[in-house]
Amino acid sequence: MVKVPATPAGIPAIRALIGKGINVNVTLTFSLDIYSDVRKAYIDGLEDLKKDGGNIKSVSSVASFFISRVDTLIDDALEDNHPDLMGKAAIANAKLAYRDFNNDFTSDKFLRLSQHGARVQRPLWASTSTKNPQYSDVLYPESLIGRDTVNTMPESTLLAFNEHGKVSESLGSNIDDATQLFVELQEAGIYMKDVTSELLAQGLKLFIDSYDSLISDIEHKRKLLELRI
């Protein structure tokens, strides 16, 4: 899959790639508003591909949410002043994203595409190991179970879940509680729009730094090879 960040500039790229039958991993998905644009770009891309006579059956895509980063940032901002709100925002955000996912991929618009073999764009839960040792080591895997989803657990988390994790379709439960949590976070001075914007900026910087480092290494290697010729 080609990685495309969930940014305003990335949205038309997602549609264009899907429209050409190219599989896409939409990465750095944090904001529910941007996620709405991501789903629309995917579905519109499938329509474009079908209109051009392409094979929509062969197209796959995921929208990757980085889970633990949300709680790490919010917990640091809360500074133990609201212990009842800590370690909950990431799961709440994922539950609301999954609700929106189900709404769009059971819509008449998508169902018409699915009759021709279109696949849903699956939510992918990344960074699902707990960073706070006070939290259960299977907190995120247990809370993020739902149909048509992917969880990229690190080996230690996978082994822990295999040993003592509990399986239930947890993503679709307690949606009202998830919505209420964001109200309570706002009352505590934490706004999800600010949180998701900061996380996206951090993620993009990591990608840019990694890319620049790779290009620098390639350039260095090229110069060494030229000296040997």
Model-derived features: where do they sit?
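Active-site beta->alpha loop and helix N-cap motifs at the rims of alpha/beta catalytic domains
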Residues: 1-13
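Short secondary-structure capping/turn micro-motifs that flank functional sites
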Residues: 10, 32-34, 201-202, 215
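Catalytic alpha/beta core domains of metabolic enzymes, predominantly
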Residues: 14, 22-156
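Phosphate/pyrophosphate-binding loops and the adjoining catalytic core of nucleotide-dependent enzymes
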Residues: 17
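Flexible, acidic glycine-rich loops studded with aromatic residues
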Residues: 117-222
